[in-house]
C-alpha cells in the first residue's frame, strides 16, 4: 500500500519473522537496482532473542555499509520498531501463550526477564534508541541516510483503537494505517523518499 501511495514499484525482501540483519539480505539489496531503499529493523531480533546489544550496533553498521557499497547515494530510510507492548521493555524470546492456546486462540507472550535488558538483552526500546543514535551519527557523512521512528507509524497512542490481535502482529486495518503513515512520512514533499 505504501508503495502504491508513493507511486513507486516495491521489491519486498521481507523474511516473515526471520529478518535478522543477515549479510545475504544486505548483499541482495546491494546488488539489486533501486532508486531508494527502506529497511525496518527490530522486532524479529527481539522475539527470536538472537542478538545482544553489544553485537547489534556493529551488525547494523555492517548491514548499512554493505547496502551502501552498491547504493552509495540513493536515499536510504531506516525504520525503527513499531510499538509492541510485550517487547517494549521485555526481551525475548517470544512464545505462544499457552493459556490462549487452551482457549483456542493464538496469542504471543514475551518470556524474557525485563532485568536482562540491563545486561545486554534487546528490547524494542533499546533497539529504537540505538538505531536513532547510530543513524544520527552516520548522517554526518551520509546526507541521504534517514531515520523514521516506528512509533510514528504505530505507537502507544494507537494501541487502544488498533490493538494487536495476537499481541504481536497488526491486523489488516492497522496495516493500512501503517502503510498510509509510511507513505505520508516518506514520500510527501520534503520526505526522505520524495520525488522518486
How would you label these PLM feature ranges?
Residues 88-148, 177:
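Substrate-gating cap/lid alpha-helix
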Residues 163-196:
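Histidine-centered active-site loop/cap adjacent to the catalytic His
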Residues 11, 77, 146-148:
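Hydrophobic/aromatic beta-strand patches that form the interior of the parallel beta-sheet core
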Residues 42-57, 114-125, 166-169, 173:
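The substrate-binding groove and active-site-proximal loops of carbohydrate-active enzymes
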Residues 19-61, 66-69, 81-88, 107-109:
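Oxyanion-hole/transition-state-stabilizing segment in secreted/luminal serine hydrolases
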Residues 71-76:
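A short helix->loop->beta-strand "cap" motif at the edges of active sites that frequently abuts
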Residues 53, 92-96, 164:
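Short secondary-structure boundary/capping segments
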Residues 1-15, 23-30:
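Serine-esterase "nucleophile elbow" of acetyl-processing enzymes
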